[in-house]
Amino acid sequence: MSELSISDSAAVPVVNVHQRKKKRIPLLVMLSLVWFAVMIIIAIAADWIRPYSITAMDLKSRLVMPGHPQHWLGTDEVGRDVLSRLIESIRVSLLIAFGATIISTLLGTTVGFLAANFRKTVEQVVLTLADFQAALPFLILALSVLAFFGNSMVLLVCLMGLYGWERYARIARGLAISASSQGYAAAVTQLGAKQSWVYLRHILPNIASTLIVSMTLTFPEIILLESSLSFLGLGVQPPKSSLGNMVGYGREYLTTAPWIMLAPAFVIMFTTLSISILGDWLRDKLDPTIR
């Protein structure tokens, strides 16, 4: 008995140590979380922390190098403060990414629920549209739409919202069909609850974790897509500025004033990388098959 009790008491601290290690957030994830939080704070407080107007020009201070006491990140070819434009670009790019991700999630989840509920013809139509969307290069579609209809902020956000909806539709459809076959959803339906109530109140909360992980995958992709469109001149238009817009304008001065292009390029790289790392960490935490 004494040997058994000693061995049991010795095993308890080991288990506790392993549990604490599992609960500890990795350093890389913590750094990614801090970076993304800083980006959100900058986007919210852009009007208060921006030192100059993004359209304010000073031809006497053209192409000032970073480190100047009045222009910490230097100036561009017409004397505009790079830091001020970078802060505004972060706000615009995050606004587009957040809006488009929410639209894509709502659209795909709704369509997926409709396919799971009605099945048959509706399901076949949804799956066909999802296959078509997945096979179509979205950048070419976006370029065609923006070139034909012109570009405005509302149109750009709505167009970006069409990106990746088929991913959410497939996830929502598959998980909704699986959840509907389980006892709790069938029991609520037999009690007389409406299908819309069953999907919103019982099925959606059970698949929310998977949708959140998918959103962390879509968000950086939309940032890169918007940056590509703005780089090509079909995204955000002057006087507004976005990260891709700044990279597009700065490429002409890459050899003489590389800071104009490198500052927004590094923000794009670190932001998309941090969200991808957070997405992988959330997937490991929320996916029951990995636990």
Where are these regions (language model features)?
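C-terminal transmembrane helix and the adjacent membrane-cytosol boundary/short C-terminal tail
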Residues: 163, 209-217, 258-291
